[in-house]
Amino acid sequence: MKIGFWTWKSIKLSIAIPLMCSHVSSALRAELGLDEEAFGTAAAKKYETLLEKKWTSIVRLQKKIMDLESRNAALQTELANLTPTALSKRHQDPASWLPRSVRHSLESHRDTINSIAFHPIYSSLASCSDDCTIKIWDWELGELERTVKGHTRAVLDVDYGGPRSSILLASCSSDLSIKLWDPADEYKNIRTLLGHDHSVGAVRFIPSGASGTLSSGNLLVSASRDGTLRIWDVVTGYCVKTLRGHTAWVRDVCPSFDGRFLLSAGDDMTTRLWNISGSNSDHKLTMLGHEHVIECCALAPFASYQYLAALTGLKAPPASSAAEFMATGSRDKTIKLWDAHGRCLGTLIGHDNWVRALAFHPGGKYLLSVSDDKTLRCWDLSQGGKCVKTLKDAHERFITCLRWAPGIFKNVPGVSTRDANGESNGVLNTGLKGDTPDVQVRCVIATGGVDKKLQVFAD
């Protein structure tokens, strides 16, 4: 192994300085080829703790190696004990994968976890909390990587996104601000966006480009307790658009995959679909039906169209269409499915408390939900929304958030890294043809709750 000149010199000095007052200092100095000034006070001060620091680094690396060796041994044992039945289950079609047991239960937050977000490339997972912090985890290893501080009140939402060259983490807070953090620079706060008049409850990067060019651009949307949605340019930090229509707190916002539409919902018990593709952001549609505050909303992926279209008795819309179907979850304990005409296609009943978050399965067949009843439920859209799986007591207290790790979009020229992820657990062709990309699905989801725990479900 090659050692650089200055590294070698620092090692020699680290050994030599503690002996500088002994009778061997002259001989040692001659042996190492050091002059008189090498043992000066300045040099001693500079190098006196160097050896200790080097050994500390070595100990940390050794611990990391031992952890990896332990994990490797466990995986080898698991592989050796796999039966044909277990092997077939492990390599099941990602389109039918549903969460089972928890891989990692992560703890470090000191208060309720409000939101989580997966990094689009690495195995990093961000979580935010009422404790005013953001924490970055390695979900593969189940380790805390760092704690990010900057907000002065509860952090309510986080999201990864941005252009290919510079993926960012966005966060929003009860301190009325939105902050942008650079993962490539140790999550340094590079910009703070101000403009909302009350707590900012949700933030999402807006994908840019037409169907088949699924790249996240420079736009970010935020939803606030002041009743507005704001669209920001993350490069300049300017608010480029303010959307008004809601009459109370806007709890959630979801952009369409092509960036042309926004779906929002909130305390006024309405769900609103916005067309933001033109110079004027038209309020396209208002959906009414819930009997209490709407906590969450989600736009269905194209893979779900065939199942949801069957509920209308019509043919599935083309892959190029966006915002054709959607789902909302409410404090009235129900989930509602809607089409782009504002018609309620069905109401999913089963939760015993507020529905707090929704996520469509990338394979299209299922809708996942979490609730204050401490359960995670899986609804089969091919069976009209029947609940086919319930994970009871997934958390010890209310479950507040749910995220599915974003998948890999293939065959897309110039695709953004926002849509390019790390290793997947299977390949799934969603049925998109022509220039529209195939998708590799990562069978990984995460949930967070009032119990301050982050649960990672993965195969």
Curated annotation (Swiss-Prot):
PROSITE patterns: WD_REPEATS_1 (PS00678), WD_REPEATS_2 (PS50082), WD_REPEATS_REGION (PS50294). GO terms for biological process: cell division; establishment of mitotic spindle orientation; microtubule sliding. One of its GO terms (cellular component) is transferase complex. It is found in: Cytoplasm, Cytoskeleton; Cytoplasm, Cytoskeleton, Spindle pole. WD repeats lie at residues 108-149, 151-191, 195-244, 246-284, 306-348, 350-389, 394-438, 440-459. Residues 56-83 form a coiled coil. The keyword Cell cycle applies. Keywords: Cell cycle, Cell division, Coiled coil, Cytoplasm, Cytoskeleton, Microtubule, Mitosis, Repeat, Transport, WD repeat. One of its GO terms (molecular function) is dynein complex binding. Positively regulates the activity of the minus-end directed microtubule motor protein dynein. May enhance dynein-mediated microtubule sliding by targeting dynein to the microtubule plus end. Required for nuclear migration during vegetative growth as well as development. Required for retrograde early endosome (EE) transport from the hyphal tip. Required for localization of dynein to the mitotic spindle poles. Recruits additional proteins to the dynein complex at SPBs. Belongs to the WD repeat LIS1/nudF family. Self-associates. Interacts with NDL1 and dynein. This is Nuclear distribution protein PAC1-2. The lineage of its organism: Eukaryota, Fungi, Dikarya, Ascomycota, Pezizomycotina. The gene is PAC1-2.
